[in-house]
Design a protein with these regions (language model features):
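N-terminal glycine-/serine-/threonine-rich beta1-alpha1-beta2 phosphate-ribose binding loop
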Residues: 1-96
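Short, ordered loop/turn segments at secondary-structure junctions
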Residues: 36, 105-109, 138-139, 165
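Short, small-residue-enriched loops and turns at beta-alpha junctions
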Residues: 82-84, 108-113, 140-141
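Rossmann-fold NAD(P)-binding glycine/threonine-rich loop
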Residues: 92, 106-131
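A short hydrophobic/small-residue beta-strand
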Residues: 100-101
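Adenosine-phosphate binding glycine-rich loop
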Residues: 129-158, 165
Length: 218
């Protein structure tokens, strides 16, 4: 492909600052950006990235369909929320316009077990319009692979212990809410902590009913 890859950014919060910068650094062309925050709508994406003017204005998310039709990006990077239910609209509008899409949404890494109905619907939509919808998700698999590789070279393992820590302030509101930031102890236990006591069968039953939100396990 001799021309530049055309990219749209859906969601212009904290993570998009890095995502859009990566797009520009790698020589792609940023052609559209969408968000729901009235404080940044209408501004050049440079106000989020912190660079010289790019010439691309942040548009309201509800105008994505028309703008995707007009700009015809090759791919859309979605960085909004953490569950498939929350991502369904963004994925759908991309698929209907034959735009490939990838999301940072944790659940989108492999949503077939946790949100089967939504995933089947989006899968059919993507196939109908000849595009790909996928997720990068949180790299749990990456951390597990590191440990697996190290364990493979060991003759005897007594115990494996690992931890991951980060400041949720560095990420968006979705991650903060998924971790229970701002909740009282009682609210945290009710909304998040109680899920840790569920059996795999109980979780499976809730998933089938559409009542279980994967990010509640955080």
């Amino acid at each position: 492909m001799k021309r530049k890859v055309r990219v749209a950014q859906y969601g212009c919060g904290k993570m998009s600052k890095y995502l859009m910068q990566y797009v520009l650094d790698k020589g792609a062309e940023l052609v559209a950006a969408f968000d729901m925050n009235p404080e940044i709508i209408g501004k050049d994406v440079s106000s989020v990235i912190g660079c010289d003017p790019v010439g691309v204005k942040i548009s309201p998310a509800d105008e994505a369909d028309a703008i995707l039709k007009a700009t015809k990006p090759d791919v859309c990077v979605i960085a909004t929320r953490s569950t498939m239910a929350e991502l369904k609209e963004a994925f759908s509008v991309c698929a209907k316009n034959s735009v490939n899409a990838i999301s940072t949404c944790e659940e989108s890494l492999y949503p077939w077990n946790s949100s089967p109905d939504i995933t089947k619907e989006l899968d059919a939509l993507a196939k109908e319009h000849g595009c790909t919808l996928c997720g990068s998700g949180y790299p749990d698999l990456f951390w597990g692979t590191m440990i697996t590789n190290l364990a493979a070279s060991s003759a005897h393992i007594t115990k494996i212990k690992g931890s991951s820590s980060y400041n949720v302030e560095d990420y968006g509101i979705a991650l903060a809410q998924g971790h229970g930031a701002g909740l009282t102890l009682d609210e945290f236990e009710k909304q998040i902590g109680n899920y840790n006591s569920l059996s795999s069968d109980e979780i499976g039953s809730l998933v089938e009913k559409g009542e279980y939100i994967p990010s509640d396990r955080k």
